[in-house]
Amino acid sequence: MKHSPLRPVATRCLASLWLGLGAWFVHAQDTAPEARTEETSQARYQSTYNTQQHPAFASAGASFNSLGAGADRMFTFSLTGHWGKRLDSGAEVYMNAELASGVPFTNNLVGLGGFTNGEITRAAGSTPKPYLQRLFWRQTWNQGGGREWLDSDFNQMARWVDKNRFVLTAGNFSTLDVFDDNAYAKDPRTQFMNWAHWTYGAFDYAADARGFGWGLAAEWYRDNWVFRLGRMTGPKRPNELPVDWDLLRHYGDQFEVEHAHHLAGQPGKLRVLAFRNRAITASFSDATAYLRSHAPASDADRQTIFQVRSGEKTKYGLGLNLEQALSPDAGVFMRAMKADGRSETYAFTEIDASLSAGAVLNGRGWGRAQDHVGLAVMDNRLSRARRQFLEAGGISYFIGDGTAFRYRPERGLETYYSLGLNKHSWLTADLQRLHNPAYNALRGPLTVYALRLHTQF
């Protein structure tokens, strides 16, 4: 499917209009005196434009699921409104609406385990399209232990809460809104861009193709501990947009334990997360057997996951997430997860074991308190079953280079510098270097350059 040029006129006009409105709104807001006042309603907005390009890279072969080896460009644009209201009962209701556009490399989301732009799942072509992103209810029951202040943020109204509390979230939201937080690597609009950095690469969390679902999540805050449990809907068919509403049979379950601590006087948090998915998916052993028993006449015949996608499968994963401040201006993070990888990807990306680690430094030390710089490395691997399928010449949903395949872990480095333009806008330059894209030693390395403009108020 072909798209119009990289920077369509409609997107540029929308971005300019949005930034102009943002400047007007910011001027009005900056005149108000600062005070610690609880919010009873909220209206916040963000805009992000991310353009990326890569030069040509080495390739010994390819299929329709391979990243194109020639020089290429891609972009994403998003414009989001976040609105919230506190009810008389103390509950909060939030609604988010988004306008998004974008075109991936190769005009298709293929050819990598760790994709290079976290916004690309929301894009559906060069023409901006609106959609309802979130609609959820949150109730907090305070249980003592002292008070703490929650700052105003997207989908969080400024307020006082008890340190010990129980929180229930229900409706349409993202699993990542509640689970797998990290101060240094969480938001691809402001921090690292690669999928394997802003969450666990192997976390096949239940969601539609845009990354959202319907469900419930409970959180119990107790002293330095937090316990979280949730169940979310997934797609009717793996990696697609329509929702499977049979939440009793097909679902994604998450359980997370978090502990806050101090190390050498600096705060940190350690999280352990387990997930379980149940859905109608293909097993890689069945797909490999089918491929070997039916001589493929074309690359399309090698995508045998579609021929054996029957019967319910259960998928498990376990991960460890660490964030640790080294000083008020510097911190490090690490995520590691292993999933069983016996069945195809349900809703995220094709990674079965992931390791990501890095550091972030604030620019206060050189007189740029609004700036920050980050550096991270990643290591993505496949399960034995998925690897054997690819080695047999199979083509999966996002990856598979056909017969020109020699397995190696997909490894990469990402670094960025985020320049604060004013109180509400940042311009980020980003560099990613990926070895063995889509786990194929016969392709790459791949270098991706990115420029991102983000505004929020």
Q: What do the predicted segments below correspond to?
A:
Residues 41, 75-81, 131-135, 166, ...:
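Hydrophobic, lipid-facing positions within transmembrane beta-strands of outer-membrane proteins
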Residues 43, 47-51, 95-99, 168-172, ...:
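Transmembrane beta-barrel strands of outer-membrane/channel proteins
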Residues 256-258, 273-312, 333, 340, ...:
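Outer membrane beta-barrel transmembrane domains
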Residues 85-87, 97, 139-141, 172, ...:
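Residue-level signature of outer-membrane beta-barrel architecture
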Residues 133-146, 375, 445-457:
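Outer-membrane beta-barrel "beta-signal"
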